[in-house]
């Protein structure tokens, strides 16, 4: 009994040695191909990040004595390489071979990669459990958009220009290239909260000349670059032109706005503008700068047709009123005389009331004293209205008084 136990204890170290030897033999079998020759994967492929539409390259280095190298994409064999020639099943997957220091290097090239090609890349030997693997990432460059292709701004006036990168696999670095003179410029980047693959870059500047603005999106790791350019036109603010139209300024700004006129068209347009402005300015000066007003309206009496008509009607009405007034006075004086009035007495009265025509004295002083100031005639007084009653008196002869009728 004790001897049996002793023999069991003595055999335990032999069991451990057997396990170690079995593990070593299993590892050696793993790196041996079907023909029994030993080989291994010395260096497997490396991770790669490429752009959509470009090429992806992977290298796998194995020891001498290999029989078959298999390349798999997402656990699907896409390329097989034999010592003499590759076995190509898809034209998008090709192979290159190199000998380096007694080892063999196989290179797999994936042409025109697509986002669906992203996944695990594996290089393995036939009947071998050891392999090398890597991961392929395909990046997609999205759109780069500036809302306006041609911008027109005022000189020395601040403005903002936006650039929109959208549908990128990951957001790029945004920068601006200025092809014009500016007094100030700055930009900032604002990601879109609702879309992690989109963002907005805003450029604030104060332009001083015409030029271009370029929004640049880059992936430094891939050395990829995409840009969008916009033309910026600066318009000089006119000085004080009195509210007129600056025809030369308008013509000079047409090419920058995308319009082009021949020489004869520019000359004709300038002449047409001048011919249009000349009568406009003339009418403005005559009608707006005249200080005289008439008829209670706010227009010039010399150039307004309606005021001319009203003025003519007023003059005709005034002449007609004066004529009627004179006729009424004449009729009133003739109708107010008494029928018993003697014409001889009237003649005597008229003769007696006349002033002397000349001075008969030869002495100048006496002549001057006798020649007093001329008598004012009674008919030089301003006429009275025809509506008031009138009375005529004969003051020539105090002895004879004519009867007078008061109307």
Curated annotation (Swiss-Prot):
Main location: membrane
Extracellular side stretches: 1-266
Its membrane topology: Single-pass type I membrane protein
Record key words, sorted: Cell junction, Cell membrane, Disulfide bond, Glycoprotein, Immunoglobulin domain, Membrane, Repeat, Tight junction, Transmembrane, Transmembrane helix
Entry coiled-coil feature ranges: none
Disulfide bonds listed in the record: 60-123, 163-215
Listed GO biological process terms: cell-cell adhesion
Biased composition (Polar residues): 389-407
Ig-like V-type domain location: 39-139, 142-231
Gene3D superfamilies: Immunoglobulins
Chain positions carrying an annotated carbohydrate: 59, 103, 210, 231
Note: A protein of the expected size has been detected by antibody binding and Western blot in at least one of the analyzed tissues or cells.
Quaternary assembly: Interacts with MAGI1 at tight junctions, forms a tripartite complex with NPHS1. Interacts with LNX1 isoform 2 via its PDZ 2 domain, it may also interact with other isoforms containing this domain.
Protein name: Immunoglobulin superfamily member 5
Phylogenetic lineage: Eukaryota, Metazoa, Chordata, Craniata, Vertebrata
